Amino acid sequence: MKQVQTKRDWKKLAYDVVEEKVITKEDAIAILEADDTEILEIMNAAYIIRHHHFGKKVKLNMIINTKSGLCPEDCGYCSQSIISEAPIDKYAWLTQEKIVEGAHEAIRRKAGTYCIVASGRRPTDKEVNHVIGAVKEIRETTDLKICCCLGFLNEDQAGRLAEAGVHRYNHNLNTHANNYESICSTHTYDDRVDTVQKAKQAGISPCSGAIFGMGETIEERAEIAFELQRIDADSIPCNFLVAVKGTPLEGQKELTPVECLKVLAMMRFVNPTKEIRISGGREINLRSVQPIGLFAANSIFVGDYLTTAGQEPTADWGMIEDLGFEIEECAL
């Protein structure tokens, strides 16, 4: 006779997390390996944790791509890399005026955080000064929180960004350390961890996450969440691979919507007090179950991503309202 596997009590696990009991890697793997029919129970349990720490608030973030393409790195997932043949817009730095204009567009989209992103391995000091000039004007004229994502930083650059008023610095780990060489050869996993630590040491809130669906195992997927816990990332963007034509990963099978939901739930269980953001690939990978993702996550991007389109801001606002949730404006 076939043995019936005992179902996990996901609610009990959630209340254990709320009571600050330690979740194990085995617990995280169990979430990822659970039968798809359990997904609503898992998301309901994740919501217990999410609601305890964040209530019904949803934080909106907006990206501006201030420098597109022209990157010397060979990241296999990225349409902006030197080896990509994807047909994207390529341009050098936007003017400070354009960057500041983008901040006011972020406000119109009800975003509380404005993310200034530039392609490339690392910024020059001149480029950092260019960003700082825009940041200072934005700080003087808005209440937005500012996040930067400019590549690898040295200690001096991190310090100057902090002094200028940058609240958060994004530098994703992208994938598990064991999987890193399969997606990039021009820098290492440790290089990425180093920049996250430099930003934190400078007094900037660290933002770091991953792109799921790049060939990592279930166990590695869980270990990524614990690694983000270890480096104490305050904000964790969960991206889901969009297999862009013209990139080395164009043939990679994308995750199913339920697999994406399990990742979001697992991330909430492992990092209960952190901002969990549904990021790149949200519309393409989660599709019609996007709203369910917000029962684990408490943050999304509004508008377009770096080189892929997002849905209209009104659709995001409507989704949040339909759930009975509320937009958290201008709060980090």
Curated annotation (Swiss-Prot):
One example GO MF annotation: biotin synthase activity
Needed co-factor(s): [4Fe-4S] cluster; [2Fe-2S] cluster
Gene Ontology terms: biological process: biotin biosynthetic process
Gene3D superfamilies: Aldolase class I
Sequence positions that bind [4Fe-4S] cluster: 71, 75, 78
Pfam families associated with the record: BATS, Radical_SAM
EC number: 2.8.1.6
Listed name of the protein: Biotin synthase
Source species: Bacillus cereus (strain AH187)
